């Protein structure tokens, strides 16, 4: 994966030059994706031009926060800690949510998802405010697997100016992280969006990333991402079945990709002809 390093560095440098910026800002969660992007940005621009925001929520894993803090320190990044608790408490009060308990266990699953998405959008608000204050661009940290599956919050973590890793599947990110010497404790941990306590990507998605990415590669090669007609979609499902993928996986993951198309496209605008 070392051959990806220079193209990613060049991409960041070129995008900033073309847009007239010198600095970037990103959210640093302690996860592997943001660690890879922070490392790439530092290599591309120098640590003095990269700012990291650490934005833990009430249910954030302390280990994740510590990993983010240590990485920012090791990369010599200017960093800022923004606690999301006050925003969450106000939101919960308005919506009648009970936040008592260490891990918000009194919230039902729908409320947990709403709170998680709310936090993702508050984080992006903070990132864009910081970008405005610093005359910087917001860097995205979503990988290709997440983007295709819609596993992210629209106008939350899926909102950014540029993204150097959005063309890499999650399994490629792991290899990339090792090539960049990202700390092993970050590489080894279970992938988690940290939307609520004890949440993990692979539990949510129902499959491990190795299997997911194998499926997505085959799905994409068959034109599945662009398929819009039911007949075409059924034909793709049949081909995937013949390729050895089990029916439940085909149905689950293809439905995720198709149902979340709106997250990958610009808002639809009705155009009037004069």
From Swiss-Prot:
Pfam families reported for this sequence: NAD_synthase (PF02540)
Residues where Mg(2+) binds: 33, 146
A cellular component annotation (GO) from this entry: cytoplasm
Enzyme class: ligase
InterPro entries, per database record: NAD/GMP_synthase (IPR022310), NAD_synthase (IPR003694), NH(3)-dep_NAD(+)_synth (IPR022926), Rossmann-like_a/b/a_fold (IPR014729)
CDD domains: NAD_synthase
Transmembrane intervals: none
Pathway: Cofactor biosynthesis; NAD(+) biosynthesis; NAD(+) from deamido-NAD(+) (ammonia route): step 1/1
Catalytic reactions of this protein: deamido-NAD(+) + NH4(+) + ATP = AMP + diphosphate + NAD(+) + H(+)
Residues reported in the UniProt entry to bind deamido-NAD(+): 121
Top-level taxon of the source organism: Bacteria
GO biological process: NAD biosynthetic process
EC identifiers of the protein: 6.3.1.5
Ligase as UniProt keyword: yes
Binding locations of ATP: 27-34, 141, 170, 192
Single Gene Ontology MF annotation: glutaminase activity
UniProt KW keywords: ATP-binding, Ligase, Magnesium, Metal-binding, NAD, Nucleotide-binding
Family: Belongs to the NAD synthetase family.
HAMAP family: NadE_ammonia_dep (MF_00193)
Subunit text: Homodimer.
Function: Catalyzes the ATP-dependent amidation of deamido-NAD to form NAD. Uses ammonia as a nitrogen source.
Protein name stated in the entry: NH(3)-dependent NAD(+) synthetase
Organism: Helicobacter hepaticus (strain ATCC 51449 / 3B1)
């Amino acid at each position: 994966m070392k051959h990806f390093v220079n193209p990613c560095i060049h991409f960041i440098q070129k995008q900033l030059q073309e847009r007239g910026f010198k600095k970037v800002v990103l959210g640093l969660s302690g996860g592997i994706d943001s660690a890879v992007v922070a490392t790439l940005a530092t290599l591309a621009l120098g640590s003095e031009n990269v700012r990291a925001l650490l934005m833990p929520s009430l249910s954030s894993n302390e280990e994740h926060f510590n990993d983010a803090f240590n990485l920012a320190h090791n990369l010599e990044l200017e960093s800022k800690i923004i606690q999301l608790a006050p925003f969450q408490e106000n939101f919960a009060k308005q919506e009648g949510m009970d936040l008592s308990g260490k891990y918000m266990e009194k919230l039902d699953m729908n409320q947990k998802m709403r709170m998680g998405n709310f936090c993702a959008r508050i984080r992006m608000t903070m990132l864009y405010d910081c970008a405005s204050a610093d005359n910087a661009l917001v860097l995205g940290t979503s990988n290709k697997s997440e983007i295709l599956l819609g596993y992210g919050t629209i106008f939350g973590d899926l909102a950014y100016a540029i993204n150097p890793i959005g063309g890499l599947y999650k399994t490629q990110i792991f290899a990339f992280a090792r090539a960049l010497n990202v700390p092993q404790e970050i590489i080894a941990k279970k992938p988690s969006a940290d939307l609520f306590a004890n949440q993990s990507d692979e539990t949510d998605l129902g499959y491990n990333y190795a299997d997911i990415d194998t499926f997505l590669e085959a799905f994409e090669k068959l034109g599945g991402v662009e398929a819009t007609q039911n007949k075409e979609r059924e034909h793709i499902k049949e081909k995937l079945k013949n390729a050895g993928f089990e029916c439940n996986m085909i149905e689950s993951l293809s439905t995720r990709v198709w149902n979340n198309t709106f997250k990958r496209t610009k808002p639809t605008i009705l155009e009037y002809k004069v």
